[in-house]
């Protein structure tokens, strides 16, 4: 390939001391190219950069599936809400993944779990959820250190988003009351979760 390779004899003719297989670079004078060629090159480079950015975004959020993230409401539509992360990347919260009592205003910060990342024609689409059981589980992991530390295990979750939920927990340490630890003193731990979920009635059993 003459655009990617150069023969050893050609390099030596230029007075360069290179061995077979080594990389050789040469300065390109863009003034020798026409305007059309330069514009074409610019377009190709912009396209490649955009492609790499999309690949990086897909890889980044594929690793975040199942994690809670916070986004800023940018635009609300009838069927979905558009949020932006702290780098300006777009994320979608579909209507069916919203708690019925949720009401979003532009500029408001919203927490949700990354449900999945679609990749249609190399266009990453980050889908969020607030109705997923996993969202409730992650909230408990944040509010209850014993769950995050593995001292308490969430065995099952049943939920009608925005209305009620049952969370079954257990501990292998007899010194820990799993229900009491999840609820907290005077309900301090569970109240934050209840507020986040639009006052969903949560029973811990």
Features from the language model and the residues they span:
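RNA-contacting regions in translation and RNA-metabolism proteins
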Residues: 1-205
